[in-house]
Amino acid sequence: GDPEMILKALYDYYERCGNLPAPGLEEKEIGFLLVLSKEGRFLRFEDCRMGKNQAKTFLVKKHVGRSSAVAANYLYDNSTYVLGYADMDKDIEKNKDNEKKLKETLTKRNSKEKECLKAFTDKVNDICQACPNSEDLKAICQFYKQDKTDILNAISQDPLWDDIKKNLSKKYSTFSFRIEGERKITAEKRELLQLDAAEEDNAEDGL
């Protein structure tokens, strides 16, 4: 074989591989960002949707496997985890004339929201302790010092909230954080992702 051809084939191969996320990471569609102040105050939602059914992708830590178990993702997740708001408005609407059913649905929703929000908050606090110098994480930690009601009060003032609520079942309806003044979202900052050594070595090679 012609050495130049072989080199070209190798080069093309590396080019293709260069687009694969490093182990431990994945490209994730994230439809909405909570923009927080450095003090952890909710400022606004940032809409990252592109067209009708897609959103911008970010390179974040690989998602956790959960069939029905409660397990939080790394600084991003669905509304039940990040906002303590479950996508159950339709169920409530459907049962609104059946008092018993309605009560059951509301109870179920409430316990699901509490459990998932707590899992996400605990995860945020763990990450905060592991990376104590991160201003981003300090802000997110501060945000989660509020309870479910405070969070809902803050986000429901946002003009995007009604539209977000209607689209919670969409594939892109994942939420993450950007701190005001930062270009990157917190969940894609490599130095905060606590990749284990093998993942880190591969990440270095991928640069």
What are these regions (language model features)?
Residues 1-207:
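Conserved phosphate-interacting/catalytic interface
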